[in-house]
C-alpha cells in the first residue's frame, strides 16, 4: 500500500501530485486525517474512491475529489436498495475520463429502475436548465453516476444541478434540493490536453424519506405442496411472489440458524442457535437434492411428506427426523459425487473456519447425546488440532454435515437472487445472545461471560424480570482482535440478507446481567455500570452496608407465612437454619434459585411443592444489594428493592 502526504492549498482544500505508469489499472484509494501529535486517525465513510485510468493519450488527469463523510440517507447505500429495490439490471457503458473532457461523478442510490439521473445547468452543453435537454448520465458504476462533458463547451464558473427523469418520457421525477452547484476549473492552454474528474458528490434528495411495506414471518410457517411438513427455504420464492403482487419490498425472517441440541421439539426456539453461522437443516428442500434410486424407500418418504403436509400444525420432531433420514440415505447414494466436486470443495474451504468446528460439534453432540460440551471428555475444551484430527478420522460423518450446509447455502443463495430479481429485499434477525451450549461458546469461550445470563429488569408485565439464559458478551475481549467474530458473523449474514433486525438493540450497549445461579431477573445488574463502594455509601448517604445483612437473603421468622402460608413451619424445618435474633439462613442445598429449581424438578408436581418452591425463590430475591461480579467488595442496589421485606 502506498501512502502519500497531501499539502494544504487553503483552509478547505488539499492537493498531491503523483506519477503513474501508463499501464496502470483501476484501483481504490481513501483519504485519512492524521493527528500529528498523537497519531489518531479519522477515516472516510463507505467504500473506497475508485481511480479509473483515462483513455490512452491522456498525459495528465486532475481529480477534484471530496472527503466522503457519512451522507444523508446512508441506509440507501445498502444492498437492500443498490442490489434490490433500486437495482439497475441493464447498465450503460462505462464512462472513461478523456483529455479535453470534464468527468462529473455523483452518488445517487435512490434513482428508481425506470428513471435515469441527468445534469442540467446554465450552459448550452448542460441544457440551459431545460429538463428536455438535460444531459443523461451513465449508471455503469451505480450507485455512482457519471458523465463526460467536452471542456470546450464549458465556461467557468458554471452552475448546475442534478435531477432524475423518467427513462421513457423524460418527465422530471425530482430535482435535487438546495442551491445551485458551481463548477469552477482554472482554464489554461493545457486544459484540452488533460482529463478532469470531479468526484465525491452526493445527490441531495431532500423531501420525504423512502417508505415501503414488508412482512415478517418465520420460515417454518410457510407451507406449500412441495414441503415436507414444514416451511423451507424454497417456499420463500412463493412468499416473494406474494410480496410483489401486494406491493411489498421486504420479507423479514426469524433467525434461520441451526438450533439442533436434543433432536426434540425443544429445539424449535429459533433464538437458541447452536451456531451463529450454520443454517438449519430443517429448512432444506430435500426434493431439490434428487430422488432415491430405491423406489420403495422413495415412496416411503413421499408418503411421509403427504402425511406431514396434511397436519394442521407442524410436527417438528417427525419433520426434522424424516428429513435427516432421507438426507442420510441420499448422501450414502450420491454424496461422493458432490463431495468430489470443485464447487463443494470451494464452499468448504471458504467457510472452513466455522464449518469444521460446527461439523465436529454436531458429530460429538450426537455421539454423546448432549450438546453440553462439558460432558465430552477430552473434547470438553475446544482444541483446534484435536478437532482437525477428529474431522480427518471421521471424514464420512463430517462430510455429511458439510453436504447439508452446502445445499442449504445453495438454496438460500438461490432464493436471495430470486428476490433481488423481483425487487424484494430479505431481512434477517440478529438475536441478542448465543446459546451457552453452542459451537461459538465451545470454540471461543473467552468472548463470552459464560458465568452470567442476559435478561431484562422487571416491569409491569414481568414483575420478576426476564432471564433469557444466554451468556453475555465480553466486549473488552472481543475488541482485542477488532471484533473479528462479529465481522465474520455479519459477512456470513450478508450472503443471504440485505438488512437486519437487531434483537434488543439496547442490550448491545448495556445489558441486564444475571448470575448463573439465579432464575429470576430481580438479582441482575446492568453491565456496564458503576457500583457503590461501602465507604461511598457511608460518606454520601450515611448508610452502613453490612454484606451479611444487606447482600444476603433477609429472612425473618415473623414473615415466613407471607411466603409459604400454611407450610411455613415445614419450610423452616426443611430448608433453613436459625441465625439468631429471629433471623434464618437457607441451608447449603437451597441457597440459590438454581439449586431450588433443580430440587423441585425431581419432586411431585403438587400445589404444596409449587408454594414451597415459589416461597424459597422469593426469599432468595429478598436482598437490598448485589455484589458486583467483577469488582468484588462493590455493590449495586437491587432493582425494585422498595417492594422487598
Question: Where are the language model's segments positioned?
Answer:
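Intrinsically disordered, low-complexity polar regions and short flexible loop motifs
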Residues: 63-81
Amino acid at each position: 500500500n502506498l501512502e502519500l502526504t497531501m499539502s494544504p492549498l487553503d483552509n478547505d482544500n488539499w492537493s498531491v501530485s503523483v506519477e503513474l505508469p501508463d499501464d496502470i489499472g483501476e484501483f481504490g484509494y481513501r483519504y485519512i486525517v492524521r493527528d500529528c501529535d498523537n497519531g489518531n486517525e479519522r477515516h472516510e465513510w463507505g467504500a473506497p474512491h475508485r481511480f479509473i485510468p483515462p483513455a490512452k493519450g491522456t498525459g495528465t488527469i486532475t481529480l477534484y475529489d471530496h472527503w466522503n463523510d457519512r451522507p444523508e440517507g446512508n441506509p440507501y447505500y445498502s444492498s437492500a436498495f443498490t442490489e434490490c429495490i433500486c437495482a439497475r439490471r441493464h447498465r450503460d457503458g462505462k464512462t472513461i475520463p478523456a483529455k479535453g473532457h470534464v468527468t462529473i461523478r455523483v452518488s445517487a442510490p435512490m434513482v428508481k429502475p425506470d428513471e435515469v439521473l441527468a445534469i442540467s445547468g446554465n450552459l448550452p452543453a448542460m441544457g440551459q436548465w431545460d429538463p428536455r435537454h438535460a444531459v443523461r448520465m451513465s449508471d455503469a458504476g451505480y450507485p455512482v453516476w457519471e458523465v463526460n462533458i467536452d471542456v470546450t463547451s464549458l465556461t467557468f464558473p458554471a452552475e448546475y444541478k442534478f435531477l432524475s427523469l423518467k427513462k421513457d418520457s423524460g418527465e422530471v421525477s425530482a430535482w435535487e434540493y438546495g442551491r445551485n452547484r458551481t463548477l469552477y476549473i482554472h482554464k489554461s492552454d493545457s486544459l484540452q490536453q488533460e482529463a478532469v474528474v470531479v468526484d465525491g458528490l452526493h445527490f441531495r434528495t431532500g423531501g420525504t424519506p423512502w417508505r415501503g411495506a414488508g412482512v415478517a414471518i418465520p420460515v417454518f410457517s410457510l407451507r406449500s405442496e412441495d414441503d415436507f411438513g414444514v416451511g423451507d427455504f424454497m417456499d420463500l420464492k412463493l412468499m416473494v411472489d406474494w410480496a410483489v403482487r401486494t406491493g411489498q419490498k421486504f420479507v423479514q425472517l426469524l433467525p434461520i440458524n441451526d438450533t439442533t441440541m436434543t433432536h426434540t421439539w425443544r429445539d424449535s426456539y429459533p433464538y437458541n442457535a447452536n451456531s451463529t453461522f450454520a443454517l438449519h437443516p430443517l429448512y432444506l428442500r430435500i426434493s431439490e437434492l434428487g430422488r432415491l434410486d430405491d423406489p420403495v424407500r422413495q415412496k416411503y418418504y413421499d408418503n411421509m411428506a403427504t402425511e406431514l403436509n396434511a397436519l394442521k400444525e407442524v410436527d417438528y420432531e417427525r419433520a426434522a427426523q424424516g428429513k435427516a433420514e432421507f438426507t442420510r440415505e441420499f448422501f450414502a447414494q450420491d454424496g461422493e459425487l458432490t463431495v468430489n466436486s470443485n464447487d463443494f470443495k470451494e464452499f468448504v474451504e471458504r467457510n472452513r473456519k466455522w464449518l469444521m468446528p460446527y461439523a465436529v460439534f454436531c458429530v460429538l453432540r450426537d455421539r454423546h447425546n448432549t450438546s453440553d460440551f462439558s460432558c465430552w471428555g477430552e473434547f470438553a475444551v475446544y482444541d483446534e488440532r484435536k478437532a482437525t484430527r477428529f474431522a480427518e478420522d471421521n471424514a464420512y460423518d463430517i462430510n455429511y454435515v458439510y453436504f447439508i450446509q452446502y445445499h442449504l447455502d445453495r438454496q438460500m443463495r438461490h432464493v436471495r437472487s430470486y428476490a433481488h430479481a423481483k425487487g424484494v429485499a430479505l431481512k434477517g434477525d440478529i438475536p441478542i445472545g448465543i446459546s451457552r451450549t453452542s459451537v461459538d461458546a465451545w470454540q471461543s469461550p473467552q468472548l463470552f461471560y459464560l458465568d452470567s445470563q442476559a435478561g431484562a429488569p422487571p416491569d409491569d408485565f414481568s414483575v420478576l424480570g426476564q432471564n433469557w439464559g444466554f451468556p453475555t458478551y465480553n466486549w473488552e475481549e472481543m475488541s482485542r482482535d477488532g471484533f473479528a467474530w462479529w465481522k465474520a458473523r455479519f459477512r456470513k449474514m450478508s450472503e443471504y440478507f440485505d438488512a437486519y433486525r437487531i434483537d434488543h438493540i439496547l442490550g448491545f450497549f448495556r445489558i441486564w446481567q444475571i448470575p448463573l445461579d439465579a432464575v429470576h431477573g430481580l438479582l441482575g445488574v446492568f453491565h456496564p455500570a458503576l457500583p457503590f463502594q461501602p465507604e461511598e455509601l457511608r460518606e454520601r448517604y450515611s448508610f452502613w452496608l453490612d454484606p451479611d445483612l444487606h447482600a444476603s437473603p433477609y429472612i425473618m421468622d415473623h414473615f415466613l407465612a407471607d411466603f409459604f402460608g400454611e407450610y411455613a413451619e415445614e419450610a423452616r424445618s426443611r430448608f433453613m437454619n436459625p441465625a439468631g435474633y429471629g433471623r434464618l439462613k437457607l441451608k447449603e442445598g437451597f441457597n440459590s434459585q438454581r439449586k431450588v429449581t433443580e430440587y423441585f424438578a425431581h419432586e411431585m408436581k403438587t400445589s404444596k411443592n409449587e408454594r414451597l418452591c415459589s416461597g424459597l425463590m422469593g426469599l432468595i430475591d429478598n436482598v437490598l444489594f448485589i455484589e458486583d461480579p467483577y469488582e468484588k467488595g462493590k455493590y449495586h442496589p437491587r432493582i425494585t428493592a422498595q417492594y422487598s421485606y
